[in-house]
Protein backbone atom coordinates (compact mmCIF):
# COMPACT_ATOMS: atom_id res chain seq x y z
CA UNK A 1 0.00 0.00 0.00
CA UNK A 2 2.65 2.53 1.04
CA UNK A 3 4.80 1.38 -1.88
CA UNK A 4 2.08 2.21 -4.40
CA UNK A 5 1.45 5.64 -2.88
CA UNK A 6 5.16 6.48 -2.82
CA UNK A 7 5.51 5.36 -6.43
CA UNK A 8 2.47 7.37 -7.59
CA UNK A 9 3.65 10.54 -5.89
CA UNK A 10 7.39 10.50 -6.50
CA UNK A 11 8.34 8.17 -9.37
CA UNK A 12 8.12 10.83 -12.09
CA UNK A 13 10.18 13.38 -10.13
CA UNK A 14 12.79 10.78 -9.13
CA UNK A 15 13.02 9.54 -12.71
CA UNK A 16 13.53 13.07 -14.02
CA UNK A 17 16.34 13.58 -11.50
CA UNK A 18 17.99 10.28 -12.41
CA UNK A 19 17.76 11.05 -16.14
CA UNK A 20 19.52 14.38 -15.57
CA UNK A 21 22.53 12.56 -14.16
CA UNK A 22 22.49 9.39 -16.26
CA UNK A 23 22.38 9.78 -20.01
CA UNK A 24 20.87 6.31 -20.41
CA UNK A 25 17.08 6.14 -19.97
CA UNK A 26 17.11 2.45 -19.03
CA UNK A 27 19.70 3.07 -16.31
CA UNK A 28 17.61 6.00 -15.04
CA UNK A 29 14.49 3.82 -14.93
CA UNK A 30 16.31 1.10 -13.01
CA UNK A 31 17.80 3.60 -10.60
CA UNK A 32 14.39 5.20 -10.04
CA UNK A 33 13.09 1.93 -8.65
CA UNK A 34 16.21 1.49 -6.51
CA UNK A 35 15.76 5.01 -5.09
CA UNK A 36 12.13 4.38 -4.17
CA UNK A 37 12.99 1.03 -2.56
CA UNK A 38 15.77 2.68 -0.56
CA UNK A 39 13.41 5.48 0.52
CA UNK A 40 10.92 2.89 1.78
CA UNK A 41 13.62 0.98 3.65
CA UNK A 42 15.03 4.15 5.22
CA UNK A 43 11.71 5.89 5.94
CA UNK A 44 12.30 5.44 9.68
CA UNK A 45 15.29 7.82 9.40
CA UNK A 46 13.21 10.58 7.77
CA UNK A 47 12.51 13.61 9.97
CA UNK A 48 9.46 15.60 8.93
CA UNK A 49 10.25 19.30 8.86
CA UNK A 50 7.28 20.71 7.01
CA UNK A 51 5.57 20.56 3.65
CA UNK A 52 7.90 19.36 0.91
CA UNK A 53 10.44 17.82 3.24
CA UNK A 54 9.67 14.25 2.12
CA UNK A 55 10.08 15.24 -1.54
CA UNK A 56 13.38 16.96 -0.73
CA UNK A 57 14.58 13.93 1.23
CA UNK A 58 13.72 11.55 -1.62
CA UNK A 59 15.36 13.92 -4.13
CA UNK A 60 18.53 13.89 -2.06
CA UNK A 61 18.51 10.08 -2.10
CA UNK A 62 18.08 10.15 -5.90
CA UNK A 63 20.96 12.59 -6.36
CA UNK A 64 23.27 10.62 -4.07
CA UNK A 65 22.43 7.32 -5.73
CA UNK A 66 22.92 8.83 -9.19
CA UNK A 67 26.33 10.13 -8.21
CA UNK A 68 27.26 6.79 -6.67
CA UNK A 69 26.12 5.03 -9.83
CA UNK A 70 28.39 7.28 -11.89
CA UNK A 71 31.28 6.65 -9.52
CA UNK A 72 30.84 2.92 -9.95
CA UNK A 73 31.05 3.42 -13.68
CA UNK A 74 34.39 5.09 -13.03
CA UNK A 75 33.98 8.73 -13.90
CA UNK A 76 36.37 9.61 -16.67
CA UNK A 77 38.26 12.59 -15.38
CA UNK A 78 38.72 15.38 -17.86
CA UNK A 79 42.34 16.60 -17.96
CA UNK A 80 42.51 19.79 -15.98
CA UNK A 81 43.25 22.60 -18.37
CA UNK A 82 43.29 26.02 -16.85
CA UNK A 83 39.84 27.41 -16.34
CA UNK A 84 38.36 27.94 -19.75
CA UNK A 85 37.42 31.57 -19.93
CA UNK A 86 35.45 31.06 -23.10
CA UNK A 87 34.79 34.04 -25.29
CA UNK A 88 31.38 32.85 -26.41
CA UNK A 89 28.78 35.41 -25.32
CA UNK A 90 25.66 34.27 -23.49
CA UNK A 91 22.65 33.81 -25.80
CA UNK A 92 19.95 36.46 -25.34
CA UNK A 93 16.99 35.43 -23.17
CA UNK A 94 14.52 35.98 -26.01
CA UNK A 95 16.60 33.69 -28.26
CA UNK A 96 16.79 31.05 -25.52
CA UNK A 97 13.00 30.97 -25.40
CA UNK A 98 13.02 29.54 -28.94
CA UNK A 99 15.22 26.55 -28.03
CA UNK A 100 13.01 23.51 -27.33
CA UNK A 101 13.43 22.11 -23.81
CA UNK A 102 13.86 18.58 -25.19
CA UNK A 103 16.80 19.79 -27.26
CA UNK A 104 18.45 21.40 -24.22
CA UNK A 105 17.92 18.19 -22.26
CA UNK A 106 19.51 16.13 -25.04
CA UNK A 107 22.52 18.46 -25.15
CA UNK A 108 22.94 18.17 -21.38
CA UNK A 109 22.61 14.38 -21.64
CA UNK A 110 25.33 14.45 -24.31
CA UNK A 111 27.90 16.00 -21.98
CA UNK A 112 30.53 13.72 -20.46
CA UNK A 113 29.51 12.18 -17.13
CA UNK A 114 31.65 14.59 -15.13
CA UNK A 115 30.53 17.72 -16.96
CA UNK A 116 26.86 16.70 -16.85
CA UNK A 117 27.04 15.88 -13.15
CA UNK A 118 28.79 19.13 -12.22
CA UNK A 119 26.43 21.14 -14.44
CA UNK A 120 23.37 19.56 -12.81
CA UNK A 121 24.66 19.90 -9.26
CA UNK A 122 25.74 23.52 -9.70
CA UNK A 123 23.23 25.00 -12.15
CA UNK A 124 20.10 23.03 -11.38
CA UNK A 125 20.52 21.81 -7.79
CA UNK A 126 22.35 24.84 -6.38
CA UNK A 127 25.44 23.20 -4.85
CA UNK A 128 28.70 25.15 -4.49
CA UNK A 129 31.89 23.99 -6.17
CA UNK A 130 33.31 23.12 -2.77
CA UNK A 131 30.29 20.89 -2.04
CA UNK A 132 30.47 19.32 -5.50
CA UNK A 133 34.15 18.61 -5.01
CA UNK A 134 33.44 16.78 -1.76
CA UNK A 135 30.54 14.83 -3.28
CA UNK A 136 32.50 13.70 -6.34
CA UNK A 137 35.94 13.38 -4.80
CA UNK A 138 37.44 16.06 -7.03
CA UNK A 139 39.01 19.43 -6.30
CA UNK A 140 36.99 22.63 -6.26
CA UNK A 141 39.06 23.79 -9.23
CA UNK A 142 38.19 20.62 -11.18
CA UNK A 143 34.50 21.32 -10.52
CA UNK A 144 34.86 24.90 -11.76
CA UNK A 145 36.70 23.69 -14.85
CA UNK A 146 34.12 21.00 -15.65
CA UNK A 147 31.29 23.53 -15.32
CA UNK A 148 33.07 26.03 -17.57
CA UNK A 149 33.60 23.37 -20.23
CA UNK A 150 30.00 22.17 -19.97
CA UNK A 151 28.67 25.72 -20.31
CA UNK A 152 30.97 26.39 -23.27
CA UNK A 153 29.78 23.24 -25.03
CA UNK A 154 26.12 24.07 -24.36
CA UNK A 155 26.56 27.66 -25.56
CA UNK A 156 28.16 26.39 -28.77
CA UNK A 157 25.19 24.05 -29.32
CA UNK A 158 22.73 26.88 -28.68
CA UNK A 159 24.58 29.29 -30.99
CA UNK A 160 24.61 26.70 -33.79
CA UNK A 161 20.91 25.95 -33.29
CA UNK A 162 20.00 29.66 -33.37
CA UNK A 163 22.15 30.14 -36.48
CA UNK A 164 20.44 27.18 -38.18
CA UNK A 165 17.06 28.71 -37.27
CA UNK A 166 18.08 32.06 -38.78
CA UNK A 167 18.02 33.85 -35.43
Which residue ranges define each predicted feature?
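Short helix-capping/turn signature of helix-turn-helix
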Residues: 9-12, 21, 120-127
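Sigma70-family region 2
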Residues: 20-23, 36-51, 72-74
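Arg/Lys-rich amphipathic alpha helix in sigma70-family domain 2
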Residues: 44-45, 60-80
Amino acid sequence: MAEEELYKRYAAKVNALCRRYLADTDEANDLTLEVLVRALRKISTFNYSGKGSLAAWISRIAINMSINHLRRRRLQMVPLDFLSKDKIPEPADEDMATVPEELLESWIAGLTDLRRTVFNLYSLDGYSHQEIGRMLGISERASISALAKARKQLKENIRQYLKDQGL
